[in-house]
Amino acid sequence: MTPMKRSVQTQVSEPFMESWGEESLPELPAEQSLTEYSDLEEAPSAHTLYVGHLNPQFSVPVLACLLRDTLERLEMPVAREHIEVVRRPRKAYALVQVTVHRDTLASLPWRLQTALEEHLILKELAARGKDLLLSEAQGPFSHREEKEEEEEDSGLSPGPSPGSGVPLPTWPTHTLPDRPQAQQLQSCQGRPSGVCSDSAIVHQQIVGKDQLFQGAFLGSETRNMEFKRGSGEYLSLAFKHHVRRYVCAFLNSEGGSLLVGVEDSGLVQGIRCSHRDEDRARLLVDSILQGFKPQIFPDAYTLTFIPVISTSETSVPLKVIRLTVHTPKAQSQPQLYQTDQGEVFLRRDGSIQGPLSASAIQEWCRQRWLVELGKLEEKMKALMMEKEQLQQQLQQHGPVSCTCCVL
């Protein structure tokens, strides 16, 4: 009985399993299924990244420029139109549309850590005292931003809210130590300063140097500050004439600065200035100022080239040329400087007067001598008052009698 029952059960179960497998689990060709899955893994997909804790001190174009450069260093090139920056008084964040593999998103933490250690400009992108927050956005951001604002008001550190996005793998803040200054400057050691400066401009690594952001506001023109846009062939055509006019005018007044690459409204734009252009500008300024009379010494002026961080990529670095004339030292007699071409210029409020005629130069000398004469008269009055006070003190004490005794 037992063998018969076992055989019957086996005969019944086998057709049942065969029929169930055929109906519910249709077999697919192995090669086709593997190919489809491999294609899905290799094809990049579109994602929206949420970048938080941006520095609200920068403007929207500057934040977009720095964020674009940051993503390029992380091997995630993004077009400018795919970056949307939202800036508020106390915070700023961005939404970035990227098309990358899932593995690339997973490797963002260690690549961002490496970039932070090598590029100081990335640290300036984050708000003070905070680290950049990267997460994949999958939902609306209104609730997320409201929650982050509430947490900031309550003193809690903001983070990704549940359900609003799938955060990328995070890393502890103590794994990002501050890079020593000696290690930061190590890459620039052993090279000429000009070469180091140009390479720093190309890679947006400005170490130990001033820098300006395109679109920044520097203020308005004053008696001691003059702005020039410097577009086109400015360096080869108009720059030498402006050097003569403004340096001579600043020397004959209280000093000042000429900034080339800044609009009259005070907005920084920068001009295309390569390393060769820097050398030509230095030689031009030195050759012109050597012909001034009275003679000008090198410590009387300073010529610097300030890098400009731009939102657009250019083959030639953008810079602002700053020619500063220091306040002339007080002289025993008034001095009137003239250019290498024998012209004299004066600085008025917001304008340049000159070249002066002979009568204008005589009038200037007369006014200067009147000023010096007034100063001498004031000194004479002060000395006369001091003399009178000393005489009064002597008269109050009276004569002093002395008695001698001879033993």
Curated annotation (Swiss-Prot):
Pfam families for this protein = SLFN_AlbA_2
Q: In which residue ranges is the amino acid composition biased (Low complexity)?
A: 155-167
Chain intervals with Polar residues compositional bias: 181-190
UniProt region (Disordered), positions on chain: 1-28, 137-191
Keyword hit for Coiled coil: yes
Gene3D superfamilies assigned: Schlafen, AAA domain (3.30.950.30)
Coiled coil ranges (UniProt) are 366-398
Gene Ontology terms, MF aspect: ATP binding
Q: Which UniProt keywords apply?
A: ATP-binding, Coiled coil, Nucleotide-binding
Q: Name the family the entry cites.
A: Belongs to the Schlafen family. Subgroup I subfamily.
By its UniProt entry, which PANTHER family does this protein fall under? SCHLAFEN, SCHLAFEN-LIKE PROTEIN 1
The protein here is known as Schlafen-like protein 1
| Species of origin | Homo sapiens
Q: State which gene encodes it.
A: SLFNL1
